[in-house]
Design a protein with these regions (language model features):
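Metal-dependent amide/peptide-bond hydrolase catalytic core
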Residues: 1-108
Length: 108
């Protein structure tokens, strides 16, 4: 806004925050994170523990129930929410296998 005020004297700018949700984090030392990463490696998915700068419904749900969570799914971050966003069927299959193996190993 300051740059525009310098370039266009007299301009009026109003900023309204439409959605201000707190960031969420699950420690990389969390059993859930370790289990998901181990299972991903078992099914041939390369893993990286990292944060993301985007909105997820988890920001409304997780604070209410206080459970650890991870975002793990198919797709390329660089293609998310762009005109030609797409996911390969092979990527969907790999992650379906991850979910299946994770449930079998830790819950069945």
């Amino acid at each position: 806004a300051d740059r525009f005020r310098k370039e266009m004297p007299g301009i009026q700018i109003t900023v309204e925050v439409m959605n201000d949700r707190p960031a969420l984090e699950t420690s990389k030392d969390s059993p859930l994170v370790k289990q998901i990463m181990k299972t991903a490696q078992m099914v041939g998915i390369s893993t990286e523990d990292k944060g993301h700068y985007f909105y997820t419904d988890a920001s409304q749900i997780i604070p209410e129930i206080s459970v650890p969570f991870v975002i793990a799914g198919p797709g390329d971050d660089a293609l998310a929410h762009c005109i030609n966003e797409h996911i390969s069927l092979e990527s969907v299959r790999r992650y379906a296998k991850l979910y299946q193996k994770y449930l079998e190993k830790y819950y069945l």
